[in-house]
């Protein structure tokens, strides 16, 4: 029995007392690239295994929300608001009782942009737990019983950098709408400059840094990375590469890659494209059922635990509360 499973069992036994005495914290799951398949049964064994383990984790440890990091519907998104994929890839898969009232905050990936992203946004008015108000947006939370606050900036990295073909091109070439890309980047700069929260997170689909199949996203290394350092961002969360990674740069910015919700890829082909010392953890075992990141933010620190869909704890790291600007 690994330590994570033992912890889950212990906390299950102590659940009544934990409800009263647990350390106040904001807790959430970050999972990317979970979007099933376009043919029956419209989900994969890995997606089902992740849904089951997410439900178990939420039931025992709790979660205030789930952060969806894009590629919500493989391989070409959804066609309209009535697309059956909403039901068969999302609602019917993440259906455990423990998940029914947990909100999802959603952003789009490159495969979503091959379909109708506006329909995913509009679905927010139909589903009680699907929250996707606009292509990019800001979330604000307070840790219960404290004055400690958390901001999360949800980006559309596809409109920022351009779409990418997983088979023909590893890098997004250019944004389709340059004006929209500039608008989003300007919005983010202003938001980060004004952010006074104790923790500031940014989330998008494409990675800034990755050692895997797609590698670092040149557009984000050039345009986003300097903003993360300048404005003291705690961490950047993403998917796109189908594995789990944690990287940290010389400025202390954490890079949480959680793209193992539906596929697993062991590739390390871009390991030499990432600066020495950045990579702290990588997991892409082909026979694995995938996994996700579980984040807990307290008044003192932010903890990120990578969990395999089998229930095994793979890696854990901590990031400090940032100094108030």
Curated annotation (Swiss-Prot):
<dbReference type="GO" id="GO:0016020">
    <property type="term" value="C:membrane"/>
</dbReference>
<dbReference type="InterPro" id="IPR024927">
    <property type="entry name" value="Acid_PPase"/>
</dbReference>
<dbReference type="GO" id="GO:0034097">
    <property type="term" value="P:response to cytokine"/>
</dbReference>
<dbReference type="GO" id="GO:0032691">
    <property type="term" value="P:negative regulation of interleukin-1 beta production"/>
</dbReference>
<keyword id="KW-0732">Signal</keyword>
<keyword id="KW-0479">Metal-binding</keyword>
<keyword id="KW-1015">Disulfide bond</keyword>
<dbReference type="GO" id="GO:0032720">
    <property type="term" value="P:negative regulation of tumor necrosis factor production"/>
</dbReference>
<dbReference type="GO" id="GO:0003993">
    <property type="term" value="F:acid phosphatase activity"/>
</dbReference>
<feature type="binding site">
    <location>
        <position position="240"/>
    </location>
    <ligand>
        <name>Fe cation 2</name>
    </ligand>
</feature>
<keyword id="KW-0408">Iron</keyword>
<dbReference type="GO" id="GO:0045019">
    <property type="term" value="P:negative regulation of nitric oxide biosynthetic process"/>
</dbReference>
<dbReference type="InterPro" id="IPR051558">
    <property type="entry name" value="Metallophosphoesterase_PAP"/>
</dbReference>
<feature type="glycosylation site" description="N-linked (GlcNAc...) asparagine">
    <location>
        <position position="147"/>
    </location>
</feature>
<feature type="binding site">
    <location>
        <position position="205"/>
    </location>
    <ligand>
        <name>Fe cation 2</name>
    </ligand>
</feature>
<dbReference type="GO" id="GO:0060349">
    <property type="term" value="P:bone morphogenesis"/>
</dbReference>
<feature type="glycosylation site" description="N-linked (GlcNAc...) asparagine">
    <location>
        <position position="116"/>
    </location>
</feature>
<feature type="binding site">
    <location>
        <position position="71"/>
    </location>
    <ligand>
        <name>Fe cation 1</name>
    </ligand>
</feature>
<dbReference type="GO" id="GO:0005829">
    <property type="term" value="C:cytosol"/>
</dbReference>
<protein>
    <recommendedName>
        <fullName>Tartrate-resistant acid phosphatase type 5</fullName>
        <ecNumber>3.1.3.2</ecNumber>
    </recommendedName>
</protein>
<feature type="disulfide bond">
    <location>
        <begin position="161"/>
        <end position="219"/>
    </location>
</feature>
<feature type="signal peptide">
    <location>
        <begin position="1"/>
        <end position="21"/>
    </location>
</feature>
<dbReference type="GO" id="GO:0005764">
    <property type="term" value="C:lysosome"/>
</dbReference>
<dbReference type="GO" id="GO:0006809">
    <property type="term" value="P:nitric oxide biosynthetic process"/>
</dbReference>
<dbReference type="GO" id="GO:0045453">
    <property type="term" value="P:bone resorption"/>
</dbReference>
<keyword id="KW-0325">Glycoprotein</keyword>
<comment type="function">
    <text>Involved in osteopontin/bone sialoprotein dephosphorylation. Its expression seems to increase in certain pathological states such as Gaucher and Hodgkin diseases, the hairy cell, the B-cell, and the T-cell leukemias.</text>
</comment>
<feature type="binding site">
    <location>
        <position position="110"/>
    </location>
    <ligand>
        <name>Fe cation 2</name>
    </ligand>
</feature>
<dbReference type="GO" id="GO:0050830">
    <property type="term" value="P:defense response to Gram-positive bacterium"/>
</dbReference>
<dbReference type="GO" id="GO:0032496">
    <property type="term" value="P:response to lipopolysaccharide"/>
</dbReference>
<keyword id="KW-0225">Disease variant</keyword>
<dbReference type="GO" id="GO:0010936">
    <property type="term" value="P:negative regulation of macrophage cytokine production"/>
</dbReference>
<dbReference type="GO" id="GO:0032929">
    <property type="term" value="P:negative regulation of superoxide anion generation"/>
</dbReference>
<dbReference type="GO" id="GO:0008198">
    <property type="term" value="F:ferrous iron binding"/>
</dbReference>
<keyword id="KW-0378">Hydrolase</keyword>
<dbReference type="GO" id="GO:0050728">
    <property type="term" value="P:negative regulation of inflammatory response"/>
</dbReference>
<feature type="binding site">
    <location>
        <position position="242"/>
    </location>
    <ligand>
        <name>Fe cation 1</name>
    </ligand>
</feature>
<dbReference type="GO" id="GO:0008199">
    <property type="term" value="F:ferric iron binding"/>
</dbReference>
<feature type="binding site">
    <location>
        <position position="71"/>
    </location>
    <ligand>
        <name>Fe cation 2</name>
    </ligand>
</feature>
<feature type="binding site">
    <location>
        <position position="33"/>
    </location>
    <ligand>
        <name>Fe cation 1</name>
    </ligand>
</feature>
<dbReference type="Pfam" id="PF00149">
    <property type="entry name" value="Metallophos"/>
</dbReference>
<keyword id="KW-0458">Lysosome</keyword>
